[in-house]
Every structure is written in C-alpha cells, then in structure tokens.
C-alpha cells in the first residue's frame, strides 16, 4: 500500500519517519516529517554531473516516560560523510531501484513509481540514536546502541523498528522547545574536553535540525 504518493510531482517529496520502541508499559512511538529535493549538479573540474539532495527537518523524539527521551538524529549511524542523511536513508528504504542517483530516486518516490511505502529501515541504515541526560545541557548528550536500548533506558526497553513512508504532512518543527540550547551558538559551543563521545559533530550542527 502506498500512502501519500504522487502528491508533489517533479523531484521532491516529504516522508515521515516513525521510531517504535517496546517498553514494559507498551510500545512508545515518535515521528518526524522531512522534505527532500533531489537535483543534478555540475562538476566544474571534470565537466560531468552528479546528484545531490536538499533535505529539511529535525530529529524524531520518542518519549519513554520518566524524563527519558530517545532522539533519532538526521544522519545515519554508519554513514561515512555528512551526505549520509535521512534523505538517503529514505531512498534506500522506499526505492528498490536506488543506485545513488538521488535525483532519479526522488522522482520515483515523488511519483510513487515502483516504491514501497510504508517501508522498514534496514538496521545498517538506522539513524544515529542519542539520549540527553539534562535537556538544558548539550554536554549530556549520550549515544544509544540501537541493538541494546536497555543499556541506556533500563530492562525491557527495545527498539522494535523504524518505518518511513511518503506523506503530505508538513515538515516537523519545534524541537527547540525541548532543547533550548539548540539554536543558541554560545550555549551550544562545547569545549573539546566536554565533547560527548561518539557524536560526529561537537556543536551538533545538522544533527538535531537542518535549521542548525
């Protein structure tokens, strides 16, 4: 079943990512909506072309109760560059013909042509997962192992799955209401000795929100 397909045309689409977590109190979910634009770029040196994406959105949050929140950030945990964002994750999950041509993939998804939606994200393509010990303190960000949520949140807590699907809903905003420091350059700046371990960027630019 395809939900929300063929709504945009061209080479742009929006998708919702939903994170499902099993807890002793039942399944908890959190989701966020993102926009993707695929386009072709020219290589000045070689004269050839390549493809890229314009991606907008913010981290998905799963409230696990007791002040505990799981964040699914905007980059894939196993990504090798800043280009490995959730736009690429969505293409890999929903477009069986994805071959790293981002514009063509965006066109197929926008048209609902040969895609799978909803689709489960493969564990190797999961986003970077973190939790925040103190919502007012960026140095308290801690990486979470998707295969062992219990280590961060206690017994009986397990990542069930991550699902993406095409949608016509608006892009999610408002993460700054939970993380007041996120758009404050002075509060967000972290000295090297206090930088959280396992987090690619010490100032979190582009990890929690594309608005920085």
Predicted regions and their residues:
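Short consensus segments that form the blades of beta-propeller domains
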Residues: 8-9, 50
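Detector for Asparagine
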Residues: 11, 78, 85, 101, ...
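Structured domain cores in non-transmembrane regions
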Residues: 25-138
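Glycine-rich, aromatic-bearing surface loops/beta-hairpins
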Residues: 133-212
């Amino acid at each position: 079943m395809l939900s929300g397909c063929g709504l945009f045309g061209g080479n742009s689409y929006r998708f919702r990512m939903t994170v499902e977590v099993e807890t002793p109190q039942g399944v908890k979910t959190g989701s966020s909506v993102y926009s993707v634009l695929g386009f072709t770029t020219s290589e000045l040196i070689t004269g050839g072309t390549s493809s890229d994406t314009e991606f907008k959105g913010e981290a998905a949050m799963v409230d696990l109760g007791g002040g505990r929140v799981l964040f699914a950030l905007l980059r894939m945990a196993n990504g090798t560059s800043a280009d490995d964002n959730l736009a690429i994750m969505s293409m890999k999950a929903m477009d069986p013909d994805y071959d790293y041509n981002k514009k063509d993939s965006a066109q197929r998804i926008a048209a609902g042509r040969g895609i799978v939606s909803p689709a489960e994200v493969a564990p190797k393509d999961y986003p970077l997962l973190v939790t925040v010990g103190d919502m007012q303190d960026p140095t308290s960000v801690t990486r979470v192992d998707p295969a062992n949520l219990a280590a961060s949140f206690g017994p009986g807590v397990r990542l069930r799955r991550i699902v993406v699907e095409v949608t016509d809903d608006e892009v999610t905003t408002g993460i700054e209401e939970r993380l007041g420091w996120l758009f404050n350059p002075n509060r967000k700046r972290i000295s090297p000795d206090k930088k959280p371990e396992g987090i690619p960027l010490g100032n979190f630019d582009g990890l929690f929100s594309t608005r920085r």
